[in-house]
Regions:
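C-terminal region/appendage detector
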Residues: 2-14, 18-21, 29-33, 41-440
Length: 440
């Protein structure tokens, strides 16, 4: 079978030893070849993924064999819809070319009238360019879609304006979060096939795609996004939902807690200024390796100046690292769930001995919130202190905030993956349940 090579960044290992590579897989196997490339500067890992359907095709009852159309895989589109951002671009590229906020604007009721044909949803740059008074709406809650009409508006904007493409000419690969309702996949198929008339589509779990971006076929994916966090054990390409951990705190909760800390110290922000607080988080905050020792440091060593959009300057001090403690002590935001490190160890302890040993050396960090300075080292420290007799190894990629999209880009561009596309004529003939034959 012909294999294509796709470049993925070399992962850094936070622990003391190289992560162990896990063996072959029946339905989806990956060979990780250590190579170097001058392209983009750093060393790259060539990942060759050989795919084949694990389910044999059922013989057609018709006497006439309908030939399956083959989409242009080089022009397949990969879409990763998250609570914070929607990333998209063509398969085969190292990172997404388009990234817009998932939060959209809707006109207030008093500005719209019955029969009014004015625009109902403002997406991306439209939010900046309009003078219409808008309320901000997010169609996702903790990673799960609750407003499909708004998602359709976002994708319409992405396809037609951001990417400037006709979706009916491109196959689309969509990411789906762990533990999501099965109806999600059927809704995606309905929207892509019936609204956008795409010729083919495929849905893949986000955690699996994140793992592919690391060039692995097994691993413990620890993903901390904007609206939800997951700890997902994956063995030979298959997520293990029975021992997957879900945490309902993530980056948006960190932002809200940062606002609380700043308000308590006399720097007052409102909900309408959350985007400013989000920017402060990204530019000024970090994760302390030891928060107790960090508090002993003279405040002047932590204090920095931040200039607000109106030109006013504020001083930021201990809130720069205190806000991130919610990931390791969620009781700070009145959450009864486990800390991220404790949930990670809990998932590992639910695995059998052999699998635990393999996953312990393949802890893969993903998601935008893990980009905070010091995050990987703190998680490594917490895990090492909780299991001193084992050797947990936290692996990180420099662009792990786009790990899901990059994994989808790798997968959708491979020749061996092409039999796993679900085509529109198959959906029309067999219905939405045909998805589960190819998207598993």
């Amino acid at each position: 079978m012909a294999l294509d090579s796709v470049w993925a960044p070399q992962a850094a290992i936070i622990g003391d030893a190289p992560a162990k590579k896990v063996g072959n897989q029946a339905s989806l196997q990956a060979q990780v070849l250590q190579t170097a490339s001058l392209k983009d500067g750093p060393a790259k890992r060539a990942v060759r993924v050989c795919c084949k359907s694990s389910m044999p095709e059922e013989p057609t009852k018709s006497t006439v064999t309908k030939e399956r159309p083959k989409p242009e895989v080089t022009k397949a589109v990969v879409v990763d819809l998250g609570t914070g951002y929607c990333k998209c671009g063509f398969a085969g590229l190292p990172k997404p070319t388009h990234r817009i906020s998932t939060t959209v604007g809707k006109p207030y009721m008093e500005t719209t009238k019955t029969g009014d044909n004015r625009k109902e949803t403002f997406v991306g740059q439209e939010l900046v360019n309009t003078e219409v008074r808008l309320k901000l709406v997010n169609p996702l809650r903790h990673g799960i879609i609750v407003d499909w009409d708004t998602v359709q508006d976002i994708w319409e904007y992405l396809f037609r304006q951001e990417m400037n493409i006709a979706p009916e000419e491109h196959a689309v690969l969509v990411s789906d979060p762990p533990l999501s309702p099965h109806t999600n996949r059927e809704k995606y198929a309905e929207m892509l096939f019936e609204t956008f008339n795409t010729p083919a589509m495929h849905i893949a779990y986000q955690s699996r795609l994140s793992m592919y971006s690391y060039g692995r076929t097994s691993g413990l994916v620890v993903e901390v996004g904007h609206g939800v966090s997951y700890v997902v054990p994956i063995y030979e390409g298959y997520p293990l939902p029975s021992i997957t951990g879900r945490l309902d705190y993530a980056g948006s909760d960190l932002t809200a807690y940062l606002m609380t800390l700043m308000n308590n110290s006399g720097k007052y922000f409102t909900e309408d200024q959350m985007s400013i607080v989000e920017n402060i988080k990204k530019k000024c905050c970090f994760v302390a390796l030891d928060p107790i020792e960090e508090k002993k440091v003279p405040p002047t060593e932590h204090t920095i100046l931040y200039t607000l959009p109106d030109g006013k300057e504020i001083h930021l001090c201990q809130e720069r690292f205190l806000c991130s403690e919610i990931f390791f002590k969620p009781s700070l935001i009145r959450s009864m769930q486990l800390g991220l490190h404790t949930q990670t160890l809990s998932c590992l302890n639910k695995c059998d001995i052999a699998l635990k040993r393999d996953l312990m050396g393949n802890i893969l960090l993903c998601g935008g919130s893990t980009m905070l300075s010091g995050f990987p080292n703190r998680l490594q420290k917490e895990l090492s202190s909780m299991c001193p007799n084992d050797t947990p190894l936290v692996n990180v990629l420099p662009e792990r905030d786009s790990a899901v999209w990059t994994g989808g880009s790798i997968l959708a561009s491979l020749q061996g993956f092409q039999p796993l596309w679900v085509h529109r004529f198959e959906y029309e003939e067999h219905g939405p349940f045909f998805l589960y034959r190819r998207c598993f």
